[in-house]
């Protein structure tokens, strides 16, 4: 298929190098802030959660914890469960190592996106905060046409990777586990998404704040139950991750260097797909956070990548590896087998429910990205039309064959990243200067 071939070429080594290279540039210019100032960004984020003053001070529409939850809702989709299994199947256990390394590097991309998002944000015609990659492209660089192209791709991606593919994963999971008709799943999901998205960002953030922390905690606790039961296999799992990350040959043979190349490629790709650092999407929600400090919001971007990939994806990977579940096939089946090794039939049900809840969270999170992109292009009046189209796309995603949609949405994501990575590089000095000014780096 032509689109598939183009997609494979676009999402090849050059783009993954661009993601990593941009993260490295920002890391170097910030003095590797994400590593040298762990205590600082942890205190700024997790340490402030119990501080009412910190959470509610400054300009903005939603609290910083709500912004984090909403951004995590958008990126913590089904990929954090089945996508990790797919990465291991394609790149071996070593992919997990490179996934974490790419996330650590990508933390500074997320940080600087948020810094620039807050610095250049403004109120739109409805008085809502407008910010994100397309705003700093226009206001920071004067690249309005680039910003428009970014928004077109953002809208396409929101209907694809942020909508139909997530809905499809939920429908397939419910159909396989309970025999529920995809059409019924589609109607329920579409109604739920429409009810929340019509309430705007505050309703989206409120829902995300209730869903994400609770579901993430439950998933991690269930994962630890599997890990504890198989604790003797933990050293072996870590040994595999390290050894296969630097293996010169793939597990099934191949040319020298092929193993490490696959582990690198699929590990970095999984990290990018999971935390979205470098895509420029998450900064759209963070731009509405209540804060007067761009650098402070940048720290929340670091935490977001840490929780999404370093914690969530790594825990999923260790769970799969210690359980002995087959990781060379369908990702959802591998996860079901892993949790089933401890919880039996309930394990499969748990995976199904987790996929559905995380998919729903992604649906409501990405709806805001697409809506803001369309509003930037056509004005605030387009929001109502977008909400209707978005809900309809949820239903279509549940009942349709989405092979082409997957390919097109992946392509849109890749093309979104290009202008954003260019912008981050051009504004790298400005972003890191803001960070150093605030934290006396």
PLM feature segments, named:
Residues 18-25, 29-42, 168-174, 180-242, ...:
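Membrane-interface loop-to-helix entry segments
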Residues 29-34, 79-84, 159-171, 193-207, ...:
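Transmembrane helix-loop junctions in multi-pass membrane proteins
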Residues 32-62, 86-96, 110-141, 326-342, ...:
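Flexible loop linkers connecting adjacent transmembrane helices
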Residues 53-61, 92-101, 135-139, 143-150, ...:
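Membrane-interface alpha-helices at helix entry/exit sites of multi-pass transporters
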Residues 112-125, 224-240, 248, 252-255, ...:
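Extracellular/periplasmic helix-exit of transmembrane alpha-helices
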């Amino acid at each position: 298929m032509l689109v598939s071939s183009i997609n494979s070429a676009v999402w090849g080594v050059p783009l993954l190098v661009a993601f990593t290279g941009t993260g490295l540039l920002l890391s170097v210019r910030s003095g590797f802030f994400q590593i040298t100032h762990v205590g600082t960004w942890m205190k700024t984020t997790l340490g402030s959660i119990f501080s009412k003053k910190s959470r509610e001070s400054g300009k903005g529409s939603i609290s910083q914890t709500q912004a984090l939850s909403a951004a995590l809702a958008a990126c913590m989709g089904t990929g954090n469960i089945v996508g990790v299994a797919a990465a291991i199947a394609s790149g071996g256990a070593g992919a997990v190592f490179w996934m974490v390394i790419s996330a650590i590097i990508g933390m500074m991309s997320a940080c600087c996106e948020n810094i620039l998002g807050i610095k250049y944000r403004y109120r739109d015609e409805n008085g809502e905060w407008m910010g994100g990659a397309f705003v700093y492209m226009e206001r920071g660089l004067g690249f309005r046409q680039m910003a428009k192209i970014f928004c077109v791709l953002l809208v396409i991606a929101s209907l694809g990777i942020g909508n139909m593919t997530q809905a499809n994963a939920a429908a397939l999971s419910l159909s396989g586990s309970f025999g529920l008709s995809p059409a019924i799943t589609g109607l329920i999901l579409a109604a739920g998404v429409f009810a929340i998205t019509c309430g705007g960002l505050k309703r989206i953030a409120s829902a995300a704040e209730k869903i994400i922390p609770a579901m993430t905690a439950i998933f991690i606790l269930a994962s630890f139950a599997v890990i504890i039961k198989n604790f003797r296999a933990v050293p072996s799992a870590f040994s595999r991750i390290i050894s296969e990350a630097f293996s010169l040959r793939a597990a099934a043979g191949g040319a020298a260097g092929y193993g490490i190349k696959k582990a690198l490629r699929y590990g970095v790709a999984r990290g990018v797909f999971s935390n979205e650092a470098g895509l420029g999407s998450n900064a759209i929600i963070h731009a509405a956070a209540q804060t007067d400090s761009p650098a402070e919001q940048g720290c929340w971007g670091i935490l977001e990548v840490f929780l999404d990939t370093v914690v969530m994806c790594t825990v999923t990977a260790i769970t799969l590896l210690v359980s002995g579940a087959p990781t060379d096939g369908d990702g959802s089946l591998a996860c079901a087998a892993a949790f089933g090794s401890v919880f039996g039939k309930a394990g499969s049900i748990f995976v199904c429910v987790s996929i559905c809840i995380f998919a729903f969270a992604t649906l409501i999170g990405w709806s805001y990205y697409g809506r803001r992109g369309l509003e930037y292009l056509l004005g605030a009046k387009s929001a109502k039309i977008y909400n209707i189209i978005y809900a309809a796309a949820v239903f279509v995603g549940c009942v349709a064959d989405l092979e082409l949609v997957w390919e097109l949405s992946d392509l849109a994501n890749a093309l979104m990243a290009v202008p954003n990575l260019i912008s981050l590089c051009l504004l790298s000095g400005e972003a890191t200067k803001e960070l150093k000014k605030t934290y006396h780096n």
